[in-house]
Amino acid sequence: MSDFNKDDYLNDLPDADELANGQASPDADGADAPSDTGEQLKDDMLKDAAAEQSAGEQASEESAKAAAEATADAASDGDAEGSSLTPLGQAKKEAAEYLEALQRERAEFINYRNRTKKDMDRARQQGIIDVLTAMLPGLDDIDRIREHGEMDDSFKAVAAKIDKTFEKFGVEKFGLKGEDFDPTKHEAILHKPDPEASKATVDTVVEAGYRIGDRVIRAARVVVASPQN
């Protein structure tokens, strides 16, 4: 049996530094390989995502830049057109714009004035119609008194003033015995056969009609003499 040599045994043992650096065991290198591969894949995925994000941001910046350039070009064209005019040309252009605006305002004012006048005339006419309508029963009574000859001179003067007042405001009285019957202005309350009549005529005016211009306020209520069949 050989003698045990302490120094030789100690020299054959690996150093602590070699164990820390992984040089003592070859199996340690094989165990670290899968971990390095996973880290590499993770790094590649992060790089690809960063590249895609950068490409999207670059495309957005390019679109915004193109839109800004288009707006600037349009403004530049307008400024160029204005700057190309001489002072006299610029003054003429402004004068034409002011004239156009003035003409437009004048047309609007004329339309407003005409519309206001029509509204005032319509309101005035409606006021006359309201007064006439309220006085119709009294006017009918005056006509009945005239027909029966029971009106004295003083009352005749008052009645004449009333008639003239309505005439002043455009009120026209119509409905006379013997005139042709017109359903647009006559209201027939009775038809009386007449062997001598060749067409329908007004035989008796029960209540006179009134109109303003072409507008009939009240149709004349009449008895109509009609031809016999």
Swiss-Prot record:
Question: What CDD domains would the database entry show?
Answer: GrpE
Record-level Gene Ontology MF annotations:
adenyl-nucleotide exchange factor activity; protein homodimerization activity; protein-folding chaperone binding; unfolded protein binding
Ranges where the record places region Disordered: 1-89
Its Gene Ontology cellular component terms are:
cytoplasm
One GO-annotated biological process of the protein = protein folding
Do you know which PROSITE patterns this protein is assigned to? Answer: GRPE (PS01071)
Q: Where in the cell is it found?
A: Cytoplasm
UniProt KW keywords: Chaperone, Cytoplasm, Stress response
Query: Where does this protein have compositionally biased stretches of type Basic and acidic residues?
Result: 39-50
Pfam families per the record?
GrpE
Identify the InterPro entries for this entry: GrpE, GrpE_coiled_coil, GrpE_head
> Where would you say this protein principally sits, based on its record?
cytoplasm
Compositionally biased tracts (Low complexity) = 24-36, 65-84
* Reported function: Participates actively in the response to hyperosmotic and heat shock by preventing the aggregation of stress-denatured proteins, in association with DnaK and GrpE. It is the nucleotide exchange factor for DnaK and may function as a thermosensor. Unfolded proteins bind initially to DnaJ; upon interaction with the DnaJ-bound protein, DnaK hydrolyzes its bound ATP, resulting in the formation of a stable complex. GrpE releases ADP from DnaK; ATP binding to DnaK triggers the release of the substrate protein, thus completing the reaction cycle.
What does the similarity note say? Answer: Belongs to the GrpE family.
- Quaternary state and interactors: Homodimer.
Name the UniProt record assigns to this protein: Protein GrpE
What organism is recorded for this protein? Answer: Bifidobacterium animalis subsp. lactis (strain AD011)
Instruction: Name the gene behind this protein.
Output: grpE
